[in-house]
Amino acid sequence: MLKYALHSGGMPRNRLLRQLSAYIFRRSYSSNIRNIGILAHIDAGKTTTTERMLFYSGKTRSLGEVHRGNTVTDYLTQERERGITICSSAVTFPWSGNRINLLDTPGHIDFTMEVEQSLYAVDGVVVVLDGTAGVEAQTVTVWTQADKHKLPRLAFVNKMDRPDADFDKCVNDLRTKLETQPVCIQYPSKNQDGLLAINDVITLEQLTWQPKDLGRSYSKTKLEPSDDLRQLQEKRNELIDQLSGLDDELADVVISTESFDNVSNALIERALRRATCQQKVVPVLLGSAYKNVGIQRLMDAVNTYLPAPEERNQIYDCFGNEVAGKVFKIVHDKQRGPLTLVRILRGEIKRGMRLICSRGQAEVVSKLYEPLADEYREVGAVQSGDVVICAGLKSTVTGDLLTSSQTALRNAQKRLKQSQGTVSADEDEELDTDELFGIDRQIPDAVYFCSIEPPSVSSQTAMEQALRQLQREDPSLRVSYDSVTGQTVLGGMGELHMDIIKSRILSEYKIDVDLGPLQIAYKETIESPSLTTLSVEKEIAGSKQNVSLTLEVVKDHDELFSLDKSPENLSNLNTLRPRTLQVIRKGSVSALERGPRVGGQVVDTQIRLHNAIIGRGTADSFVMATAAQCVQKLLSTSGTRLLEPIMALQIVAPSERISGIMADLSRRRALINDVLPKGERNKMILVNAPLAELSGYSSALRTISSGTASMTMQPSGFSGMNAVDESLAERRVQGLE
């Protein structure tokens, strides 16, 4: 902002002063805000940690428990019944003079898209680890997502009250599995009663929580000279030594001082904050959310080490004082209608304000609310850096960028390019800025699909409306119409995802829909290149329609559509208008959505236009339909092979059960990648297996292991199939198996 103000040329002095004062106000206002996400593998204790934060901050009067179904952040009926987080929820609470906006995100792989959108709204994250399990499959997934967004993070090792908890292993997992630099600022200890206590590395104190008042208070005790104190002093010295190699201010003090004992706690904290915000290290804390230990110090660490909004998202400075807000979630309230959760990146949103979403639709903010899961407090205006709920937005979808106007967005993109030394504005650079602003959403491929039908014809419209609303909330839910069967088809991320959708339609919209059997979302790819010419001539409503297209399909991983610019075809293609080329492209690419064998999406395939002759007065719709028909003919001629979704599994079981589990996996066409020791008695199997072979596998695993094994599963791409498996897959899709 300042660099735009300082280079403003002949801007009137009063206007410049107003902009500078607004800039200073925004900075001072947002310095007391922390926007954080809570990320974890399923069952690591993420929601329990969130509930304790709300309780100790005074936001709630009682402790919410997952197993009792009375949590604030898991407010959906399905979440409370299952004890898992399905939708991201936002809560705001005060702590030590700061305002913390916290997003509790799902831990189950089926809801990864919820996590992805939420990370656009936060400035830092807390990653919760299960102290008995360390880094798990979904931990790696959410960590990778946080890396993508360049988010500073803290690690909180939970469940440290358990006898099988292993703090050192968790720290080593962070270092080896996540390839990060963990910095331990706490270590586990025991108090006089044998309960979990925490030794603070920086202050050299032992922290003990009081069970009688539900952990509201805790005592700090300076450690007496002992082996524990000597070990903790060594850890403090190691911390100073590690940070001094990363922070110049601390290094200067260390060089000039005679002893590490002379380095103040405040100086260590400042150095650790800078290193954390620069993503050079990850501070590691510990506790037990369920036993009410360590949560207040975790909130202190959020305030101390994670960045304020003003320290992040400088890319949005190009908006100046104009509004820039990222939509990261939409929920539907029975009384208030659609409610849109927005992270305000720049500017101020006021009640009654007119906004433009990045897709061009105009919206009016009828009301503004402060978030507390499913409760709302109305406010009049919200400043940059904060999170707000907007009512009245009718067209906005998850992932949109809200701005004051289309002009504001274009000017911001132009300023951004100028600041990066790019003055031209070609299409590729436009796409780059869209990606930088997070406008270009990447929706994961569905791995399952099924038909959905209303209980009666009269409920069809209501069901379609419910699906539209659920799609606005959840971009990973695919809804399409199968013209062959006449059915509405849902695509989703897993069995749980589809089950939750059905359950929500019943509980929230009172429609008892019928889901068809789950089908694997196979993909198709061509076997060999193929070229053909299709000429179609027809008279429609007295107007002659005439199209002749020569198209080719070839193997290609990058581009969907290209032009054959060879000398014999270039002169013809140069006569086509850009609009005509766009129509041919749209029709051709649409045909790739449904392959000839099982109706799967055709991938790794490029359509190449060689020649096009279009009669005068021919409608665009006719050209588009001809292009689609031509590609369908090519796919049938060239033939396609099936690609099936592959899942990556981590199975943990006692050593004596491993042979039986591996024998069963081999019958499921699984590829064993590794078998690793997991503690003293267990082993962990890393395996890839086709999704088609994993139906009901959780139950089968329980039977084989007598209930002693656990499993996590997540998508791991697509793989080719042999002819026998392809034939079996076709029979399954046709309902013959």
Curated annotation (Swiss-Prot):
Gene3D superfamilies on file: 3.30.230.10, 3.30.70.240, Elongation Factor G (Translational Gtpase), domain 3 (3.30.70.870), P-loop containing nucleotide triphosphate hydrolases (3.40.50.300), Translation factors (2.40.30.10)
One Pfam family per UniProt: EFG_III
Keyword Transit peptide: yes
Function of the molecule: Mitochondrial GTPase that mediates the disassembly of ribosomes from messenger RNA at the termination of mitochondrial protein biosynthesis. Not involved in the GTP-dependent ribosomal translocation step during translation elongation.
Subcellular location field: Mitochondrion
Record NCBIfam families: small_GTP (TIGR00231)
Gene Ontology CC terms, in alphabetical order: mitochondrion
Residue ranges of domain tr-type G in the record: 31-310
Protein name per Swiss-Prot or TrEMBL: Ribosome-releasing factor 2, mitochondrial
Keyword Protein biosynthesis: yes
Residue stretch of the organelle transit peptide: 1-29
Top-rank taxon: Eukaryota
Binding site for GTP: 40-47, 104-108, 158-161
InterPro entries: EF-G-like_DII (IPR053905), EFG2 (IPR030851), EFG_II (IPR041095), EFG_III (IPR009022), EFG_III/V (IPR035647), EFG_V (IPR035649), EFG_V-like (IPR000640), G_TR_CS (IPR031157)
Transmembrane segments: none
A Gene Ontology BP annotation from the UniProt entry: ribosome disassembly
Any GO MF annotation of the entry: GTPase activity
Keywords: GTP-binding, Mitochondrion, Nucleotide-binding, Protein biosynthesis, Transit peptide
Family affiliation: Belongs to the TRAFAC class translation factor GTPase superfamily. Classic translation factor GTPase family. EF-G/EF-2 subfamily.
